[in-house]
Each structure stands twice: as structure tokens, then as C-alpha cells.
Amino acid sequence: GRLSSGMVLVDRTHLHLLIRDDGCGVFARIQEAFAIDTPQQALLELSKGKLTSQPEFHTGRGLFFTSRLFDVFDLYANHLTYQHSHWQRREWLRANPLAVQGTAVFMSIALSATRTLDEVFAAHSRGSQDFSFARTEVALRLAIGAEGQTLESRAQGKRIAHRLEAFEEVDLDFDGIDAIGQGFADELFRVFARQHPQVQLRARNMNDQVAAMVAQAR
């Protein structure tokens, strides 16, 4: 793209920022750079953190930590919307995304917010004295999309597990996932876990059916 713009608005209670450009869209850019099948899969990879197509210029941490610093973080591109809200502590795809040319980012934070960037770093690091990016979170609802596909196959398990060996701890959030297949669970919780024993996988927000399938795989 050739054009970019930004806007800052401060009202009585919040600071709002909007940044946009007219490029190809961040998810399409990542899809092309990393030979990923779809923009939605590119969104999933971006949400994990440590993903950059230009490592000489940035580390790939910016989106992950910025989305957790602000109260509301919305990323619009390629007919997809990635959203993260501080109070719900979750990530999701919007069913009716905003159609924009290029990429648009909206961020909002209450003027009364007290959390600091150091606190955000510490929540995903080895400890208070080491801010290395060691912990990530993967919202599995991002893998099923707004249409609600199921997580059944071994290939889907590999897609979720891709690059997780770059982290020491991974929280797998099953919020919004009603069921998973045996192949998916086995690939993620047995095959990947045995190949990368240094990575601690934690499954949370599971219903009884999902928990039983995960326990069987382990």
C-alpha cells in the first residue's frame, strides 16, 4: 500500500486509537510470506505471537502484547476481524467483519486503567526478572472460524501445534469448542507432547466431552 493514517480520540473516560493503511491486508501478507493455506489460518498464527515476516526489523511480539495491554483491540483485514478484550480475557473472530481495504487497527483503553506494560510482559515471561516471551495462549475458537467448523482431524491438530515449540508454556483455550476428534486430540496432546517434552501444554475451559478426549490422548 501507499497510504496510512492514524487518529487519536480522548473522551472523558477512554483513549481511542485508529490506525489503517491501504495495503493487501495483514492476514494476506502473512499467508503469502509463510505459505499458509488461508487468511484465517494466518490470523491464528499471528495470534500465537513470535511471528514476523521481517525479523530484521521487529520480533513479532507487538500485536500479542499490544492486544493485551489495551482494553479493546480489534484488527480488521481480508474480510476477517481479530478481537481481544481485556475484561473477557478471550479472543474471537467476528461473524460479520468490517469490510476495509488494507488493514485497520482499533485500540481503546480506560483512562483509569492501572496495568503496565511490565505487568503484561511478566504475565507471559519466565519470571519477574526475565521478560523473555515464554508463555502464549491459543484460542481454539480462532481455528473454527465464525462458521463453527469442528476440530476433528490430525491435520488440524498439526496446524494448532505449529510453532508452539518456540514457547515453554502454552495455554490452549477450549472456550466455545463443543467437541474435538480423536485424531485432533492425539496429534496435539500425545504426538506433539512427546516430540516436544520441554513445552508444557495446559488445556482450559473444556467441557466434559472435550476433557475426556484430551485425557484419553494423554
Residues of each region from the PLM?
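Short acidic/polar alpha-helix capping motifs at helix-coil junctions
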Residues: 28-29, 123-125, 211-213
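Amphipathic alpha-helical interaction surfaces in cytosolic regulatory modules
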Residues: 141-218
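Intrinsically disordered, low-complexity boundary segments flanking structured domains
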Residues: 61-62, 92-95, 123-131, 190
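Conserved beta-strand-loop-beta-strand hairpin that lines the nucleotide-binding pocket
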Residues: 1-118
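Intrinsically disordered, charged low-complexity linkers and terminal tails
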Residues: 23, 87, 106, 138, ...
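Short, conserved, surface-exposed binding loops centered on an aromatic residue
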Residues: 96-98, 130-134, 162-164
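Short, cationic low-complexity segments
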Residues: 119-142
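A general structural signal for short secondary-structure boundary/capping elements
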Residues: 63-66, 121-123, 216-218
